[in-house]
């Protein structure tokens, strides 16, 4: 699935003015697709954007949770996993460049 396909699939959860997933790394898209199945069950869940900044992911979302520390923990966990996948993808790219 591409980022565009992902964004179309989850369009009901991406508010106007936001763009959702902003890059194409297949492993990241597959991971997010699985995670989104749970996230969309959270009351008030909105996906704002997922972007790379200095080769580190930023995962922006919002929920109706009163305890925003829960959002911060969830964000930390998701960003950590995506960063791992991004790093693996960039290492594969380097290997292909030198072989």
Description of each model-found segment:
Residues 1-81:
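Long, charged N-terminal interaction/targeting segments
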Residues 69-99:
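Cys/His-clustered metal-coordination modules, chiefly Zn-binding fingers
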């Amino acid at each position: 699935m591409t980022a565009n396909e992902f964004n179309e699939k989850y369009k009901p959860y991406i508010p106007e003015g936001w763009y959702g997933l902003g890059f194409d790394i297949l492993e990241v898209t597959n991971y997010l697709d699985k995670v989104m199945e749970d996230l969309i069950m959270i009351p008030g869940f909105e996906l704002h954007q997922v972007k790379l900044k200095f080769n580190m992911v930023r995962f922006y979302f919002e929920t109706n949770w009163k305890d925003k520390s829960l959002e911060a923990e969830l964000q930390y966990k998701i960003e950590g996993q995506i960063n791992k996948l991004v790093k693996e993808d960039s290492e594969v790219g380097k290997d292909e460049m030198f072989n």
